[in-house]
Amino acid sequence: MRNAALELFNDRLPHKPYFSDDLHFGVRIAGKERAILAKYIQFNQPHAMFWLGFDVDRIGAAIDWSDRNAPAPTLTITNPENGHAHLLYALETSIRTAPDGKMKPLRYAAAVENALRKKLGADTGYSGLICKNPNHSHWKIAVWQPELYTLDWLADSLDLNAANDKEIVADYGLGRNCTLFDKTRKWAYRAIRHGWPE
């Protein structure tokens, strides 16, 4: 049976993703053909985010998004042993995370991501680099939302003001990019004014 969400996941994988079969031994890089066989895999490109990913560490994580009035994830990838899950939201338009990316859309995406993380009660320590690989038979996968999300569509069901309060986690997800920019730009402006790099 054809699974459009899984096909989309595979199409959007990096050419050489990080992967692991056992996170205790770290991650490695290989071609997509090898990495796609592993239990864990890098799901976003190095400089573009096609998916918002969340790690929810509680029993029933794959279904309690509904009880929390959160938008339906595109995919849930559940550990059958403990019920913990990764929830992935497919974006219609990728978010440019490279150094040349524009800050305004990045800040908006970070606010949406943080608000959704809070609504889902997702792990703030999750780096978002790799996820449970939905291609691997160890995990249970479910497709909930077949349509691709826009940030505005996600934002419609979230309180972005609450997401930008004192609880915002500066080193979580896209917030890392914004924090890095804010911390380095002041130094860079001063350095350029003082004639750096000459």
Predicted stretch roles:
Residues 91-95, 151-198:
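Modules that initiate DNA replication and primer synthesis
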Residues 1-85, 91-107, 126:
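Signature for HUH/AEP ssDNA processing cores
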Residues 70, 117-125, 189, 193:
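Generic surface-pattern signal
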Residues 90, 124-152:
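Short, conserved secondary-structure transition motifs
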Residues 93-123, 153, 157-164:
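Helical (often loop-to-helix) elements that flank the catalytic cores of nucleotide-handling enzymes
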Residues 119-131, 167-172:
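Short secondary-structure transition/capping segments
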Residues 63, 110-113, 117, 181-189:
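Generic detector of well-ordered alpha-helical segments enriched in charged/polar residues
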